[in-house]
């Protein structure tokens, strides 16, 4: 970590705690700042705030009082989940207080090379793939950012020989100014988080901030399956490295079920350790980054062949009596489930689907579920999912929860079949989040394996 004096003896307000806010507050204190933390959660229910107070950091909890900004703050560090139309943020900007993101703070003190990964889908898997390939190739890739390791925490233990492999959300990229990765990846761009950004155009603009400070000596890896990426490529100073599953490009591409990089045959599609067309795209993006980082083809091939996936993202759990189990609880929308199903022979798949009812029908899913061996349906949206199953001519059964669904799927499964949890729905009707839902699937699998 670099020693900088930017924040020394400067009053800094950290707005919003969670893990990134806590990490930012501790880093700022280490840099000599006079830190105040403001979090909406009441102090007596806020162990993080209590811990920071014990360390001498001022905390204001339970509300976001605008008068707090009457103090002469030199900077605000904003939690990424807090929108820019938040009254505290608006007042800070009106007072011309610079509003920084936590990843920008980390960047300012980093002496490590930075690889930044963003996009609508596939960020976590691609970030993990890249880190694993770098580490297998003898480099030290440190996971950071939206993947669960706050950048401002990771950066404190990193040095100039390390590479930060940073997953970045659109929330984190909004408002970055100096942030400059040496290699950036945009996996894909889909209409999402529009409630936060207001429009698809504003969402794309936030993602595109990743390349604002890049030059021709930096590399931007883009998905040329998408026309929008091809158009955006014309507007950056960075050197473009495209990847595509549909055409031969001057980067990473698929030809005759083989993955190539600029004419070099790297590996077979069938050897990628995780199934699904989306994971072919993730592997291509990883190959592009790995080649730019000087990793050998053998290391790339071995790492991607042995890659077991990321928890809750088409995660291969193993087999019970020849029946394979895949946990794709992160599939909270139709598109994600479509991509998951693309990696399997439908005639051998028992799909567990359903969850929070957002009022949408599932007709888009009909071509993808046609031919499934069976479906097990659960949650608020069960009636809508069942209508799609009926139209697709797929048999189905009802389940009370994920545990019940696994047992019902197991009853109809035979050796060689696949039990796939890919709900196409959010989890909040029955579970706190998709992780809890996925953990119940894993626990039930472990119980079956132990019988």
UniProtKB/Swiss-Prot annotation:
Source superkingdom: Bacteria
GO cellular component, one term: cytoplasm
Binding site for ATP: 119-125
Metabolic or biological pathway: Cell wall biogenesis; peptidoglycan biosynthesis
Location, primary (coarse class): cytoplasm
Broad class of enzyme this protein falls into: ligase
Cell compartments where the protein resides: Cytoplasm
Record bears the keyword ATP-binding: yes
Name under which the protein is recorded: UDP-N-acetylmuramoylalanine--D-glutamate ligase
Organism, scientific name: Streptococcus agalactiae serotype V (strain ATCC BAA-611 / 2603 V/R)
